[in-house]
Amino acid sequence: MQRFPDPLRRHPVTLPDGSPHRLTVFLKAAIDHPNIEVGDYAYASAFEEVEDWAACLAPYLYPGAPERLAIGRFAQIAAGVRFITASAYHPMGGVSAFPFRIFDPAQMQHYRGECAARGDTVIGPDVWIGHGARVMAGVTVGAGAIIGAEAVVTRDVPPYAVVAGNPARVVRMRFGP
């Protein structure tokens, strides 16, 4: 009888020679970031070894940011996927899109407020995210959804939807009515 590996084991795949496949990780064991929550058995893969999975997947999410990233149980994340969290955005309502506020500690609180307004990014359980996809800030991806390779997800994805494209659109549902 096959057993599930320990969800806290960093490298869950064992190669035929007995060595761990270092390019696939259970994220719960690989990410230590105060703004990222990961469910059991969620995994990610890469084409080369990754030292900092939090920075790889969510490069703009800094500790203390007002937003968070939640990745559900059994989520599957392919190489090159990025979560573009709210801290990556630039102001667009003024004369310049340059983020002056991030360089002035006295103004940082205003920037944090703008980021918080976009909300958290939530990936439901059993979601499969294809190679190179981008998931933008504040998006919720429903349980069992599939995101196609290189898709740019700018809106919420319903449970069990298959989405593709830029911007991502529902191309079908995994299960019929």
Language model features with spans:
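Beta-rich strand-turn-strand
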Residues: 117, 132-145, 151-154
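Short, intrinsically disordered, charge-balanced linker/junction segments flanking boundaries
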Residues: 169-177
